[in-house]
Regions:
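Short alpha-helical interface patches
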Residues: 7-11, 36-44, 104-112
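Intrinsic disorder/low-complexity detector
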Residues: 91-102
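Short acidic DE-rich linear segments
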Residues: 181-182
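Short, structural beta-strand-to-alpha-helix junction motif
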Residues: 2-4, 32, 102-103
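Ordered, small/hydrophobic-rich secondary-structure cores
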Residues: 1-28
Length: 182
C-alpha cells in the first residue's frame, strides 16, 4: 500500500509551513498543518516530500493577492521555507514493508534527493547529518518514522550565510525515527 496524505500528515511537525503541490504544478500554501481543511487531501497519494521556498502573505490574516504573472512582484508577500508535499491521484509503484506502520525504508524513496537531512533518534535525541538522501545509511531502515520537520542548519554554505532573508537553503529536513511505533 502506498503512502496517502491522511497517513503522512500525522508525522508532519505542527509548527512548520507547508506547501501542498500537485503533479500538474498547482499548489496551496499553509502556515500550519492545522490550517489544512480536514480530509481535504486525505484521498491523495504522496508523490514526494521535500523543502521549498514559497510565497506567503506578509499579513498572516489575509490571503495574498494573485499576481497573474510568472514572476511575483507583490509587496504583500514574502518567500519563506516550507515542507513541500507533492500529491498525486495515483500511487507511485513503490512496495511497502507493511501497511500498519511507517518505517524509514518506506519513507526514504519519497524524500527529496538532497540537501541537508538530520536523522534524529527519539530514544536519546542523538542525530546524524547527511547531505544527500542516498547518504542516509540502511541502519535506519527498520526504524519507525516518528516525525518530519525542518530546523535551522548550523553549517550553511558561506553564500547562504550572508543572505539576509529566510530560505530553505538555511534549513535542513529533520526526520525523527524511533525503535517503537508511534
Amino acid at each position: 500500500m502506498a503512502i496517502q496524505f491522511k497517513e503522512i500528515k500525522k508525522y508532519i511537525a505542527r509548527n512548520v509551513r507547508l506547501s501542498i503541490n500537485h503533479k500538474d504544478g498547482y499548489y496551496e500554501n499553509y502556515l500550519f498543518m492545522a490550517d489544512i481543511p480536514e480530509q481535504k487531501y486525505d484521498h491523495l497519494y504522496v508523490y514526494g516530500i521535500g523543502m521549498i521556498d514559497v510565497e506567503f502573505s506578509n499579513d498572516v490574516y489575509t490571503v495574498p493577492a494573485k499576481s497573474g504573472e510568472a514572476v511575483i512582484t507583490s509587496k504583500d508577500i514574502t518567500l519563506k521555507p516550507a515542507i513541500e508535499i507533492v500529491l498525486s491521484e495515483k500511487p507511485r509503484p513503490i512496495q511497502r514493508s507493511n501497511d500498519k506502520e511507517l518505517l524509514f525504508r518506506d519513507l526514504k524513496p519519497y524524500l527529496q534527493n538532497g540537501r541537508n537531512f538530520a536523522v534524529v533518534k527519539r530514544e536519546d535525541w542523538s542525530s546524524e547529518i547527511y547531505e544527500l538522501r542516498r547518504d542516509i545509511p540502511e541502519k535506519y531502515d527498520n526504524m519507525h518514522v516518528y516525525g518530519i520537520g525542518m530546523e535551522d542548519h548550523p553549517w550553511v554554505e558561506e553564500y547562504w550565510r550572508d543572505v539576509d532573508y529566510e530560505t530553505m537553503h538555511k534549513k535542513r529536513m529533520v526526520i525523527v525515527l524511533s525503535e517503537q511505533s508511534k
